[in-house]
Amino acid sequence: YILTKAFAYKVNAAKFPHADGEIKVAIIGSGPAGLGCSDVLNQLGFKVTVFERDDRPGGLLMYGVPNIKLPKEILLAKIKGLEEAGVQFCLNTNVGIDISWSAIREQYAAVVICTGSSQPRPLKLPGNELAGIHYAKDFLTSTTKGLLDHQLTPGTFLSAEGKDVLIIGGGDTGADCAALALSHGAHSILQAELQDCNMARISQEGFCELVKGDVSLQYNTKVKRLLGDDKGNVSGAELCRVEWGHTDSGMPVAKEIEETTLVLPVQMVLLALGFSGPEPVVFEKFGVKKTPLGTIANVSGSFLAAEPGVFAAGDARRGGGMVAWAFDEGWDAALECAKYLTAK
């Protein structure tokens, strides 16, 4: 909400650089961390190029947040301001695939990795091979891209119209999916969260989205398996209630409650289980190491991620979180990068 208002009133409007510098910096990823980082480095006089694998800049903000939460004209205005200030965006370019990491390192004095945490956690239960099961990111992206391309016609996007939709995961991404499915005209929407309401990660804004719509948000609910029809499409889900306790070592554990199992009709399943970290190409191609949590390892107390001149910021470094945190990471990483380049 705060970022939307800030964009609308140009609080974060890009400023023109203090000097026309010749030192080139590459930023990989144009999500909130990448945008924040590019803004600061550009203001400090560095020549900034942002590499983005998608057809539009913005990353998570462009395709991972529905228009009903962040109108894209606001985001596009922010990006236009950055371009006018001198930031260059290189789109449809997947670093490590379309352009090699070695080429990036040769051409740029420093690199800031802002790829985000975009590797979705997989579904691990019987029936996960059925058609009609989609990651939340793919569902959100298909509608947003269709709207922006003016191609939102039947068959061109993942539509929930007339379907019984099961959303697995009770966080903000799940709430976004619920709101979007509601706008599609879904027949029913159930959002199932294994944790109780005190453990689940959903903001007040996300909760209000569900309350305003005809969405059933069920905590302490376990999806046991998904059922399919004779054509291999998902047709139902078996669920049960759970109660939380602790193991002898104190770890929380969910125990199924007897006689609470039920089967519901389902024609679409959306997986909002969070993300496990950056995608494999980041670790395979960029020379960075992975933490036990799946994020990019960095020098303690620093944004430095690998060899000198390589930094990481945002969800790629700290794990999934709020958009505001990613912007903040991008700003701070830019300052550290600038300090490194100035000293060099």
Feature map (PLM): residue ranges:
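FAD-binding core/adjacent interface of flavoenzyme oxidoreductases
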Residues: Y1-I28, V87-D164, L270, I296-G301
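A short helix->loop->beta-strand "cap" motif at the edges of active sites that frequently abuts
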Residues: A109, A186-H187, P308
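Active-site proximal loops enriched in glycine and acidic residues that flank catalytic Cys/His/Asp
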Residues: T115, K137, G169-G170, E193-D196, ...
